[in-house]
Design a protein with these regions (language model features):
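N-terminus-centered regions that define maturation/targeting leaders and the start
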Residues: 19-184
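Positively charged n-region of N-terminal signal peptides that target proteins for export
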Residues: 1-5
């Protein structure tokens, strides 16, 4: 028992700069964690006929030292061997705590000033909703907000999701996620 307490003490002393998992949170009023994503947010194309509107996202309790945010939507179940990037937006100002519904329009009109929406695996910037192949089991769509230790990532709007993901993981102080599901 004494060894367990020593381990806990060392973790607290050695990891003071790491945000605990329960601190930073992201939610959406229209997509609940582990629930089915509505047609409002489904892609319009590739055989899907949704409204392709990005959901409102809200986050709270970002860690001290956050200098910017980024948001990604990623489908790890896409039959590509490498998943599918549905939305990548970064350089979101540090005082932002909400992305309004529709902020992911490809023209960037609803996104926070100064932010960049880069390429998705649909071949365009902005939000691209769920549209898994017919007959697949429902896919998981992971909505993640990253709290970053840098003001800006040194990337442009033509950066791939994988490239942005690399920079996000190199500069994240904390991240918060929830998962929606969709199948057809």
């Amino acid at each position: 028992m004494r060894g367990a307490w020593c381990s806990i003490f060392l973790a607290i002393v050695v990891l003071p700069g790491v945000s605990m998992a329960g601190d930073f949170q992201v939610t959406s009023p229209t997509i609940k964690d582990k629930a089915t994503i509505s047609n409002e947010h489904v892609f319009n194309g590739f055989g899907c006929s949704g409204n392709n509107a990005s959901p409102e996202l809200r986050w709270e309790r970002a860690p001290k030292g956050t200098k910017s945010f980024a948001v990604t939507v990623y489908d790890p179940d896409a039959p590509t061997g490498s998943g599918w990037w549905h939305w990548v937006i970064f350089n979101i100002p540090p005082d932002t705590t909400t992305l309004t519904a529709g902020a992911g329009k490809p023209d960037g009109g609803g996104a926070p000033a100064g932010s960049i929406q880069s390429m998705t695996d649909f071949g365009q910037p902005g939000y691209g909703g769920p549209c898994p192949p017919k007959g697949n089991k429902p896919h998981r769509y992971i909505f993640t907000v990253f709290a970053l230790k840098v003001d800006q990532l040194p990337l442009q709007k033509d950066a791939s999701g994988a490239m942005v993901g690399f920079y996000l993981n190199q500069n994240a102080i904390a991240k918060a996620s929830f998962t929606g599901k969709y199948g057809r």
